[in-house]
Amino acid sequence: MSDKIMLLDGHSLLNRAFYGLPDLTNAEGKHTNAVLGFLNIMLRYVEEEKPTHLLVAFDRKEPTFRHIKYKEYKGTRKPMPAELHEQVPLMKEVLKTMEIPIITQAGIEADDILGTIGKEAEEAGFDVAIVSGDRDLLQLATKKVKVKIPKTKASGTVTEDYYEDDVRELYGVSPTEFIDMKGLMGDASDNIPGVPGIGEKTAAKIIKEYHSIENAHDHIEEIKPARAKNNLQEYYEQAIMSKDLATIKKDCDLSYDFKDAKIGTLFTKEAYQLFKELELKSLFKYFDEEEKEEETLEVVTTSDLGEVENLFSSIKKSGQAGLGVIGVSGNCKGISLTWKEGTVLALIGGFVTEDYLKEKIVELLKEGTELIVLDYKALLHFVEKVREYESQIQDVGIQAYLLNPLQSAYDYEDIARDYLRQMLPSRKEICGKKAIEEVFEAEEEKTVQMAAYLSYVPFHAYPLVFEKLKEQEMEELYLTIERPTVATLYEMEKYGITVEKDALKEYGDQLIGRIEELEQNIYEKAGKTFNINSPKQLGVILFEDLKMPFAKKTKMGYSTNADILEKLAPDYPIVSEILEYRQLTKLKSTYADGLAAFIQEDGKIHSIFHQKVTATGRLSSSDPNLQNIPIRMPLGRAIRKVFVPDPGYVFVSADYSQIELRVLAHMAGDEHLIDAYRHGEDIHRMTASQVFGVPFEEVTPLLRRSAKAVNFGIVYGISAFGLSQDLKISRKEASEYINKYFATYPGIKTYLDGNVAFAKKEGYVKTLYGRIRPIPELSSSNFMQRSFGERVAMNSSIQGTAADIIKIAMVRVSKRLQEENLESRLILQIHDELLIETKENERKEVRKILEEEMMGAAQLKVPLSIDIEEGKTWYEAK
């Protein structure tokens, strides 16, 4: 079996990888998506081709001989995006640690290096595989030289392999004749002119018959069509020059040795260290354990009562410890503790019971010990009494979230990576989909390490994280808003909300009835039955059978997304019914069917509230997601009827009125808007009067609704295009509305522009309470990304401040309910609404608390206002 060499086109593959993967950065902000994509492609082909030799060629900055021949060569190419440019030296560094030779040479391109080495390797008896995203390299294909072209398709990256015969089959010409084809058709990406009016098909036809540009010119009178003949005659010299530019050199004077390209380890210790630094975790699987040289954390495990007592005694003296719970209450395996002496797992066994460990945790707090955890809420679910000592509990997960709210997770491995520079195996890698308590005994060695990380990481990261929090001036935000919110969310999770099963079933039946009715209506109007849920079948019905406009065909068929259907709905009743059908089937699967799965033995749903998910600071929920319960359509709102209070209670709901607009008025300092709120004016009606040029008393409900869209659209940085879509008006009209709006409220325009300018300079915006929202999109080389970043800069301070205020209100309301020994409790927070399950004889007190605490949650230049409703279901209370 002969040796095989694989030659990679460095810049071409790096470019393809950059655009094929979403932006990725490590903790230091280094972009890594192109590096990761390049390595994925390379390692995949190493596995498939099994080469014995490997090298990579890169272009250089200096002009090449082609630029000298034709100064406009590649003259139309845009500069490389900064995010890609910075990864070129990084990629070379990675290849160096993997002991893969890199070849570059001034005056020539990587293509010429690949052509030269490919030819010499073939002559030396190698099988050759050349990998590039550039089809120009097809001219290098022979019977022993294969050109591999990775292509991105809907199913992922696929590879087209070309030997000499494959090129001939595809184009009807040989690889050498392919150069003549390029000479005729030109190459827009390289700014090679070719012959005007001759495209790929005509070029292939001419060269297939005449084999070269020169021979075709010798038979110029035979060339068809006439336009191609005339143009070839006129631009013959340009065609020859283009052919010359397109020809890859195979005789460059290069300094290299094949033995240097022989594949060795690839996955060296140096490579592993660099992969760790770049956080290329998905590639760690390629390394042997000896290359990883991971330090195993020294952990002591014990179930001996005497040893555990000594452990707690030692921690009391130290005054500070990291704490993690191994498992959940009722199925706990023990606790993990780290302090200055080391890490110990106190495991349940003998006299060391779950209750004993809970008592000892509380005892530590009573003695003044500071406990550092990854998740304070999880600790509350294990031992509720710790909330009495909240000032001694530090939640490193929340602190890390405040410092970088754009991450997807803040578990021990994330914090260890970002602050301790350690790459630790994640819970998922160790436990799969199972909980730690399920696998603890079966794989004790692995899970002991993981359990140790639960206390080791927060303990050692805390000083670094908290210091950074102080540097960013978010200590107060953490201490007065975020940490107190944890216990409030815990209470909401613990209480839950009752769902009436019979009402839920009735709701589901109601949906089924309407869905079936819609199905029949749609089939009648379509003239046939089909799968309404199939975009492909639906597209054929709408755009081929019914000949509707706005047809937009993709590789997968006609697009039937909501934007297109909403354009058609006013004129086509079948489309309105399809949109309603989609909404109702989603309601059925998500709520009518979905909610039933979450009802627990107590008849309640105990949704999980998340504090570390959104970039703006807003809360979210899951299992189930109660934040997304629809309110715009009647059947969507009706789902609230299934949520009921316990016997003897009613629901009291309090909803902030226009909180984001009030925050905007305060932060922008716009006197016109501030004055309107202070005098209790109808803001939307006032805006309609000013923007649409209508006397205040003549503003219709429709105009008021349009003004409302403008008001809230401005808060979210809406564009003229976006507003035109919302109001179904021309972009010009929308632009005029926005301009009139800013003329009416000039302070808002100044404020929003100031936010964008600040964000471009600093890379973030801040809320009134100091919460930071990073906006990396503003430094992107992509125009769409930058535009998105500008919209984020406009609205994040407003959204984030509103989120901060609702958290302050939640904490204050919950605290007052407890301080006044009321049996009523806060059970839900949805956007700007608080829902209180209220004892019937406590309605008056609860209303008073809501008014005082919600309206007093922030001291703004405009008053905060709330709307209070009550009822025997959530629907009635809204």
What do the predicted segments below correspond to?
Residues S2, P22-N26, G75-D251:
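Extended two-metal-dependent nuclease catalytic cores across DNA- and RNA-processing enzymes
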Residues I5-M6, G10, R16-L55, K71-E72, ...:
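Conserved RNase H-like, two-metal-ion catalytic cores of nucleic-acid enzymes
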Residues A154-K182, V299, S336-K470, I481, ...:
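Active-site-proximal helix-loop-helix substrate-binding element of RNase H-like nuclease domains
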Residues N231, Y235-F351, L371-L374, K434-I631, ...:
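Conserved "right-hand" nucleotidyltransferase catalytic core of DNA-directed polymerases
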Residues S336-E341, L403-K434, M450-V457, Q611-P695:
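Function-dense linear segments that define catalytic or interfacial modules
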Residues E438, K494, H606-S607, Q611-T614, ...:
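Conserved catalytic core of nucleic-acid polymerases
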Residues L469-I481, T485, I805, A809-I830, ...:
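Active-site palm subdomain of RNA-directed nucleic acid polymerases
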Residues G513-Q520, E524-S576, A743-R791, N795, ...:
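C-terminal polymerase-core module
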